[in-house]
């Protein structure tokens, strides 16, 4: 908290007149920033992080402010996500799945999704290379089902494949035009 006085004044006062950054406040919507992709039981399955790379400065990456991570010490080794049922009404065409993560350490994680015939299909596996940069991994998939058949009723899962506490900024789902997929 950089400006305690502004934090007690509410959202508009914080936006218009605070000095520095406040990562908490009063009368602020609880939970993750989300739209159509909701983390299932976020507090029980992951750890919230703030100011990931230290104090925020003009040189800080925008993703440094808020993130979520695995926490092996407390058994939080998989995050589960529900894609809102009305987001993708037509099950035709490709969907791009993207994960933004901090490339810190050399650990490995996977993104899994609810596919036709496989509710825990691996979309991709990432092995980090210790650049300490924010990176985004994406893949277009055509066999997605998103029928809430994964663990905890999930459509998407981030799963730790080792003992590192991987750090994530976001998960994104974007419907692609049919021509976005390369020909077989």
What are these regions (language model features)?
Residues 2-88, 117, 172-174, 184:
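Glycan-recognition and processing domains
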Residues 77-79, 95, 105-110, 164-169:
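Short beta-strand/loop motifs in extracellular/secreted proteins, especially
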Residues 82, 98-100, 112, 140, ...:
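Residue-level recognition of well-ordered beta-strand positions that form the cores
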Residues 86, 100-105, 144:
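Solvent-exposed strand-to-loop "edge" motifs in beta-rich extracellular domains
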Residues 88-98:
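Extended extracellular/luminal ectodomain segments enriched in beta-structured repeat modules
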Residues 107-120:
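Short, surface-exposed beta-strand/strand-loop-strand elements in extracellular ectodomains
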Residues 118-150:
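Extracellular carbohydrate recognition and processing domains
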Residues 138-171:
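Extracellular beta-strand ligand-recognition surfaces/modules
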């Amino acid at each position: 908290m950089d400006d305690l006085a502004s934090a007690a004044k509410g959202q508009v006062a914080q936006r218009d007149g605070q000095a520095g950054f406040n990562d908490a406040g009063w009368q602020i919507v609880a939970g993750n920033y989300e739209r159509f992709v909701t983390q299932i039981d976020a507090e029980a399955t992951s750890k919230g992080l703030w100011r990931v790379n230290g104090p925020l400065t003009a040189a800080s990456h925008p993703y440094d402010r808020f993130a979520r991570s695995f926490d092996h010490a407390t058994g939080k080794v998989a995050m589960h996500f529900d894609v809102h049922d009305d987001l993708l009404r037509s099950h035709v065409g490709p969907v791009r799945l993207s994960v933004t993560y901090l490339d810190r350490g050399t650990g490995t994680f996977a993104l899994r999704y609810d596919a036709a015939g496989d509710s825990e299909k691996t979309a991709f596996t990432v092995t980090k290379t210790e650049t300490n940069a924010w990176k985004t991994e994406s893949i277009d998939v055509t066999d997605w089902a998103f029928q809430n058949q994964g663990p905890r009723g999930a459509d998407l899962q981030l799963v730790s494949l080792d003992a590192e506490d991987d750090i994530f900024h976001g998960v994104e789902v974007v419907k692609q035009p049919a021509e976005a997929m390369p020909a077989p």
